[in-house]
Amino acid sequence: MNQLEMKKVAAKAALQFVKPDMIVGVGSGSTVNCFIEELGAFRDQIKGAVAASKASEELLRKQGIEVFSANDVSSLDIYVDGADEINPQKMMIKGGGAALTREKIVSSLAKNFICIVDSSKQVDILGSTFPLPVEVIPMARSQVARKLVALGGSPEWREGVITDNGNVILDVHNFIIMNPIEMEKELNNVAGVVTNGIFALNAAHTVIVGTPDGAKIIE
């Protein structure tokens, strides 16, 4: 079973959490795209969805699912998203698709944050396999990069990428994140940082791992 097939296994398993009349929160990325395709079969049973990226909004509309703004809802029953890395405490690195800020906003509305991944995304320590994305106000890019170097990282500007919020992304290599909560707080306090891709303060509640043997659900 290849990686895409394992993503589809996880995406299909997440459908069991979708109930009638829900507004479903969805993130962004390749695994979420699989979920949105599956969610299309529920278009007449759910009220709609709140998406964390413009790309996901477009896919939802193609499936005939009504799209709501985060400002339209006070809470969500579920939020379904992928991750670039996830540790045993259900803390994640996200932001490979540059939608990390909106993902934090929408996921914070959810009673149940469901993370769907294939088994390659599971790590013991965050930062082991994937650089940490940091969304930065454009005028602060160099200043923030210097601060990240001082903290022990090796930031790389993701040239040509502009977020849905009009900002830029620095991908920080060589961060081995032993204390994700403290690191998330520290980086978010750097002037010019909008947010960083550590999801530790708002970790997942449920993890669904797609494996060759089927979906493994961790609650």
From Swiss-Prot:
Any idea of its EC number?
Answer: 5.3.1.6
Concerning Pfam families, the annotation shows: Rib_5-P_isom_A (PF06026)
Under which main EC class is this enzyme filed?
A: isomerase
Q: Give binding positions for substrate.
A: 28-31, 81-84, 94-97, 121
Highest taxon above the source species:
Bacteria
Per the record, the pathway is: Carbohydrate degradation; pentose phosphate pathway; D-ribose 5-phosphate from D-ribulose 5-phosphate (non-oxidative stage): step 1/1
Record-level GO cellular component terms: cytosol
- GO molecular function list: ribose-5-phosphate isomerase activity
Keyword annotations from UniProtKB, A to Z: Isomerase
Active-site residues, record numbering mapped to chain: 103 (proton acceptor)
Example GO biological process: pentose-phosphate shunt, non-oxidative branch
The record's catalysed reaction(s) read: aldehydo-D-ribose 5-phosphate = D-ribulose 5-phosphate
Keyword match Metal-binding: no
Keyword Transport recorded: no
Recorded hits in HAMAP family, A to Z, give: Rib_5P_isom_A (MF_00170)
Its job: Catalyzes the reversible conversion of ribose-5-phosphate to ribulose 5-phosphate.
The UniProt entry, under PANTHER family, shows: RIBOSE-5-PHOSPHATE ISOMERASE
Q: What assembly does the database describe for this protein? A: Homodimer.
Q: Which family does it belong to?
A: Belongs to the ribose 5-phosphate isomerase family.
Protein name, entry field: Ribose-5-phosphate isomerase A
Q: Which organism is it from?
A: Mannheimia succiniciproducens (strain KCTC 0769BP / MBEL55E)
